[in-house]
Curated annotation (Swiss-Prot):
GO terms for cellular component: cytoplasm. Keywords: Cytoplasm, Lyase, Magnesium, Manganese, Metal-binding. GO terms for molecular function: magnesium ion binding; terpene synthase activity. This is Tau-cadinol synthase. Sesquiterpene synthase that catalyzes the formation of a blend of sesquiterpenes and sesquiterpenoid alcohols. Converts farnesyl diphosphate to tau-cadinol. Belongs to the terpene synthase family. The gene is TPS7. It holds the Pfam family Terpene_synth. Monomer.
């Protein structure tokens, strides 16, 4: 890697935003009913569905109801009812399940919600005493799909003889079944799971796919027109709120970018909002959602400044100013960074202004996270400018931080409600295994994408490149190893609800960060940098309503 000294780097090749002023000027297509009418109808339907939870007396009905409500994306209305139902399901265990599908579904729902179920309880439904797979389960694609999804909640203590080989077994037979005669909607559900297993799928992404599938299941026992209507109305009403916020944040970004004039950065405000929305999509999380989206954008600005424009000396001065966090240090910076630095500080001040008096301390953690990120960006810049390829261990220790999981885990807490305790902030800012694992998912998937597509930023050598050089192996071996580290990281994330039960609501939000990375880097793409590849997905979330 060539040393670039103190000269500015070449201009980037980032494509311009695919959105422009789209959301600033956007006028939603009128629906058949007004927002007020939808909100009133939702309140009525919510009461009806609450009654369904109360009316469920057997475990099978409770399990199916929880599954449907979650996959339709309306579980945020029924948190207490779901917790009560799952506690009852947990007491019943898996042993009395009548099928592989039923056992695997219970296993997944319980583990996702922080109820521990030993893997052995599920393995009984798929293996004989001698360890061989039970004859006949290969002819049960619905059961195999449920097994495949459930087994992806594997943790570190469960080894390769239980859930991991169940994943391999189920995948092999699902791929074969998919090539044959699977019917809709099972065929589509298998296809989605083979791309991203359900426990790693974003709630809103699954809801968009599952709502029309649920509509087609009117002959099924789990079908309810009341639940379906609630899901459609809730999605559309929330989408209107998200469209209003996109208008606001797009204008914020237009004003900010116009003032600071950093033409070399990735113009991705809609993508930053999407990232935040994947963590906080609910109506009651509007403050948290908008703060996190802005933190995303500010970290992206910082990343691109270090990676594609600043000389080494400029990078050092910028980091020094960020560590001191004093506007008077602006005089130390080159002209093009002065406005940027002042705007960073003023935006963090605005974050604090949005907090109640007893919440003001949160911004101290927010700033500290940004400072830590800057320090690690500088280390990468030092490596790059000195032509250094670090050891794999050193590279990972720095790049997992620059992947942003820590600063974003702090940022997602800033605007939250009572769940965002001091304990939660200490957990997020510390070297916590779950936060680190989320960072590994982000970093390794990003690096595998960059290796496949070719880097278009002046980054230091990636984890893939460092592994190849250090171990003198072909790229296929390095990529396989990095991919195995992603799977190890998911085991750590899966363990977090049981290791940190008091922080479960926060753990869920952090897990959503890892899920969003999985979608952004699906099939080794980079849907943030190359956001043209992601436009259709964003349209399904923010432009197209669901027909009523």
């Amino acid at each position: 890697m060539a040393t670039t000294g103190t000269t500015s780097m070449p201009a980037p090749v980032f494509h311009p935003t695919v959105w422009g002023d789209y959301f600033i000027k956007f006028v939603p297509e009128p629906l058949q009913v007004s927002d007020e009418t939808m909100a009133e109808r939702i309140r009525h339907l919510r009461e009806e569905v609450s009654g369904m939870f109360q009316a469920c007396k057997n475990v099978v009905d409770k399990t199916n109801l929880v599954d449907v409500v979650q996959r339709l994306g309306i579980d945020h209305h029924f948190e207490e009812q779901i917790a009560t139902a799952l506690a009852s399901i947990h007491s019943a265990g898996l042993f009395n399940s009548s099928s592989l599908h039923e056992a695997a579904l219970r296993f997944r729902l319980l583990r996702q919600q922080g109820f521990w179920v030993p893997a052995d309880e599920l393995v009984k439904f798929i293996k004989n005493e001698d360890g061989s797979f039970i004859d006949g389960i290969t002819n049960d694609p619905k059961g195999l799909l449920s097994l495949y999804n459930a087994a992806h909640l594997v943790t570190h203590d469960e080894g390769t003889t239980t859930l991991e080989d169940a994943i391999a077994f189920a995948r092999q037979h699902l791929e074969a079944a998919r090539r044959c005669s699977l019917k809709s909607p099972l065929a589509e559900q298998v296809g989605r799971a083979l791309g991203i297993p359900l426990p790693r799928t974003l709630k809103r992404e699954e809801a968009i796919a599952f709502i029309p599938e649920y509509s087609s299941q009117q002959d099924q026992q789990v079908y309810s027109p009341v639940i379906l209507e609630l899901a459609k109305l809730d999605f559309n009403l929330l989408q209107h709120l998200h469209q209003e916020e996109l208008k606001e944040i797009s204008q914020w970004w237009k004003d900010l970018s116009g003032e600071i004039g950093l033409g070399y950065v990735r113009d991705r405000i809609v993508e930053c909002y999407f990232w935040s929305y994947t963590v906080h999509y609910e109506r009651g999380q509007a403050r948290a959602r908008m703060i996190l989206a802005k933190v995303f954008m500010l970290t992206s600005l910082l990343d691109d400044t270090y990676d594609v424009h600043a000389t080494l000396e400029e990078a050092r001065e910028l980091n020094k100013a960020i560590q001191r966090w004093d506007e008077s240090d602006v005089s130390l910076l080159p002209e093009y960074l002065k406005k940027f630095f002042v705007k960073v500080i003023s935006n963090f001040r605005e974050f604090e202004d949005e907090l109640e008096s007893h919440e003001k301390y949160r911004n101290v953690y927010n700033i500290k996270g940004f400072q830590t990120l800057s320090k690690h960006y500088l280390q990468e810049a030092e490596w790059f400018h000195h032509g250094c390829t670090p050891s794999f261990k050193d590279q990972v220790n720095v790049s997992v931080i620059t992947g942003g999981a820590q600063v974003l885990s702090i940022g997602l807490l800033v605007g939250m409600g009572h769940e965002a305790t001091r304990e939660a902030f200490e957990w997020a800012i510390g070297d916590t295994d779950a936060i680190w694992a989320c960072g590994e998912v982000s970093r390794f998937m990003d690096d595998m994408s960059a290796f496949k597509n070719g880097r278009n930023k002046m980054d230091v050598a990636s984890s893939v490149e460092c592994y190849i050089k250090e171990h003198n192996v072909p790229s296929e071996v390095a990529l396989a190893r990095i991919n195995s580290l992603v799977e190890d990281a998911w085991k750590t994330i899966n363990q977090a609800p049981f290791k940190y039960p008091a922080l479960f609501p926060v753990v869920q939000r952090v897990t959503s960060l890892a899920k969003s990375m999985t979608l952004l880097f699906l099939d080794k793409r980079d849907a943030y940098t190359y956001s043209k590849d992601f436009q259709t997905t964003l349209e399904t979330h923010f432009v197209r309503h669901i027909p009523l």
